Amino acid sequence: MHRYSPNSLYKLIHPHGRWFIKGLNQSATLYTTNLGSRLRFIAKGVNNLTVNVLDNRNPFSPSQIYAWRIDGNQWHRELASHRSWHIECKSANHLIEIITAGNSDLDRVWNGDEGFAITSIDAEQGKLISAPPVPVIDFIGDSITAGCWVAGHNASIDYRPESNYVGTAVDLLHATDVRIAYSAGGVLRQATGGVPTADQFLTKLDATTFWQANTPDLVVINLGVNDRRFSLDQFNASYDHFLSLVTTLFPSIPILPMIPFSQTFAESIRSLTKKHKLPLIETQGWCSSFTDDLHPDQSGATESGYRLAEKLSNWLK
């Protein structure tokens, strides 16, 4: 058996996305504060994998959840409270994907070290190697982008980042994703878990760790829903400022703002996107089925994911 440490795993994965090395309980972990963060690697000649994680939730939260799949097949979901799980590979070569798939608004991900933490992966025979590169799309957003409330009204257990509109779209595009998205967040409203507004979480991984931005093929922005309690003038100023930040951070990458599925601040987003000379993704009629009038349920997520993939395919050619 070979044990892959957090540092070894970090060297394997591409893109690094929002993963970083963080010390917890006097040991290194492969850590992320983002629901929907993904690992991709090849298991070469491995019989079985054991993934070891911390039960790192808030004491008042349900268990965090991870999901995994082999070769793009069915996703399987695992409770972090069990601290480990097995993946049967049966030798040969297989693409393994692991995604952070459930947490709670109570988890203090920003300043309380209650993000997702992988301690090691054990491989029985064979070895782990980096996966072949595929197109990378960064998605900046809120709980809808992260994958909350897709399967129902229960925190963590009903989250589905693996099959929400982002997960659906990247599968159809044979791409992968980096999610810069936090529940309840906006350009004016702070997110849950102690997370600040989007202008601040864009460039940081938690309260003390800055993010070295990746170089994706595309950047998609889906923000605005959570800012609806603020005035139009406030939103216009903050969204304008945020677009300036994103274009500065990704100066040579196509950046595509989306109108939220609820059409919140649609006219403002159209106007400001035009001001910044960016292409706009219109979404009127994309999603006809919701969990709670704002978050697409699985049917709505699949529907909107197909439509988004169709739009983004023109930018990945």
Q: Language-model features: where?
A:
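N-terminal secretory targeting modules
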Residues: 1-140, 145-154, 158, 314-317
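Conserved SGNH/GDSL esterase-like catalytic core that processes O-acyl groups on lipids
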Residues: 34-36, 147-234, 263-264, 295
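Short glycine/proline-enriched coil/turn segments at helix->beta-strand junctions
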Residues: 45-47, 92, 172-175, 251, ...
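Alpha-helical cap/lid subdomain in secreted, periplasmic
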Residues: 71, 200-317
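A structural signal for isolated positions on well-ordered beta-strands in alpha/beta enzyme cores
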Residues: 97, 138, 178, 254-256
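Solvent-exposed, flexible loop/coil residues
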Residues: 122, 192, 298
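Conserved beta-strand scaffold positions in the cores of enzyme catalytic domains, especially
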Residues: 139, 177-179, 280-282
